[in-house]
Amino acid sequence: VLLEVLGFRASLWAMAGLLSLVLLGVVVYVPKLMGKSKASKSAKELFAKNQGINLLAAARVVLFGARDVWFVVGVPVFLYASGWSRPMVGGFLALWTIGYGAVQAFAPHLVKRSPDGLSTEVPAARLWSALLAVVPVALAVVVYLDVPNLEWVVVGGLGVFGFAFAVNSSVHSYLVLAYAGSEK
């Protein structure tokens, strides 16, 4: 409804404005000491002792941020602008979510497990990350070339992206635990 009434840009500005009002309400009305923790001794306490965990955490922030931008704003707007009805867009996103979960559950069967828990898994994470980086670039080229049946080509590309993303996410989750070792 918001897109139909205000359009895309104005809708984003309206949502940003409403979130700003919520933030202002939190600042004004939430008690000052609520949720306040003890001051940390240094900024180093925010990070794990293991560099692998810190790198994976940074990668996950970027991965999930990219996924959320695509699937909260970009994909629904693209599909709706391509003539898909709301139920079709919602159905696609529902199937996407179910498929994503199925791939994540199957991911341990795709990545061979090594005795040390890292020697096979780290290269696998690099491989799946590279694939994940290539797919959006390929999709951008396809959109630029304006191929016939563009929305279906994009949907297929998003399927490949989702598959790679789900495997990547699963491998990253495993590696965080593997790197943590006794810190679990």
What residues fall within each predicted segment?
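Helix-to-loop junctions at the C-terminal end of transmembrane segments
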Residues: 3, 102-122, 143
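Intracellular helix-loop hinge segments at the cytoplasmic ends of transmembrane helices
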Residues: 77, 169-180
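Hydrophobic transmembrane alpha-helices of Major Facilitator Superfamily
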Residues: 65-70, 102, 163-171
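A membrane-interface helix-boundary motif in multi-pass transporters
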Residues: 3-17, 149
